[in-house]
Amino acid sequence: MTFLLNIMLMSSTSQNVAMPYAELPGQCIQLTGDLVEVVYYYPNGSIKQIGFLENGNKTGEWVSYNLEGQIVVKAYFENNLKEGKWKVYNDEGELQYKIQYRNGKKVWAQEYDESGNTTAFNYK
């Protein structure tokens, strides 16, 4: 998933922002220095995604939710590059994939069935 956000924060208060890629409302809260927490919402008001920007780049954990509030992706970024272990869940909250990234490139991926058994493993 690629999410774009061009925001310049002038104060340490929270503010509402428009998300141009999806026209969904969002909120930015400056935490410390250049670290900003970003929260995106579905039109019904439920949280769609939470993550962090540092100097305008994605950093740390980003969590995406479905309309029912179930986690569908736990992702990690470092300086706007995919990094570390990502987990992808189905709408029932069951783990479907684990994907390992290093410097923005996929290192390996593991797929799971409904019972949690590994069904595929891909190493690059």
Show the residue positions of the predicted features:
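Glycine/tyrosine- and acidic-biased, solvent-exposed loop/turn segments at the edges of beta-strands
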Residues: 3-124
